[in-house]
Amino acid sequence: MIEIERIRAALTKRPRFADRVFTEEERRYCFSRPNPAQHFAARFAGKEAVGKAIGCGVEFMWRDIEIAGRPKPSVTLSGKVAELAERFGAGDIDLSMTHSKGMAAAVAIVQSRGTQGPLNQAV
């Protein structure tokens, strides 16, 4: 969950923020919407949720997780995040994103491929 205003401020004060965090396709989509900050915030929350669900926390290249699609978001992994997902036995990723006037949130569920790995261990 993230405050939309934090993303709006980052987009305004740090011109390279969008380039560092979002893929070209994500930027194109968000900037085409009437209120880009809320769409960027939802995708930011989505990336964070996916990273945590896979098991890499928030220590990853943000652009290694791309969120596309409307109305149902789809997730594409690349780079180190894709390598970790493979090693951890990650399968399909279900993602739900939402935003209100002031907040954006996301929940990610990573399904196991049924192989050995951290995603298959009981907690």
Locations of regions flagged by a protein language model:
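Core catalytic alpha/beta fold that binds nucleotide/phospho-ligands
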Residues: 1-123
